[in-house]
């Protein structure tokens, strides 16, 4: 919402991924945009017609999914194809023109990280760290993200103080009934 993610999930199927994303912040996703990285199937489409959503974006939609989604009034369904999900450039308006530049999509070499504390990260903690790093780069201003290995748990963003962003993220986790 407002250029910040309010949910994200990974699952064994699209519906499970969607359910995890929604459970991150069941209030804020109302009226939002939902994006997928693979074809939307009929089971997922049935879930998508329940809430009020502005837009659904995916590489493709099954014929049955499209028939289901067409029944929802004022819903924009955008099929971008697999290449459409590649995000290589950003455009920003500035005084007197626009700034068109290559986006910073570098992931870093996480496998080369060195733990400098006495406690080594467990595999699940390292996976949570990787997901958190991927997500936080999409959150604006004093971004705080809590994640586990397959779900965004809470977001704090847009505050003058990082401490306030942390408080918001912790509150969001608590309100969603999730655990840090």
Protein language model annotation of sequence segments:
Residues 1-180:
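ATP-dependent carboxylate/acyl-activation modules
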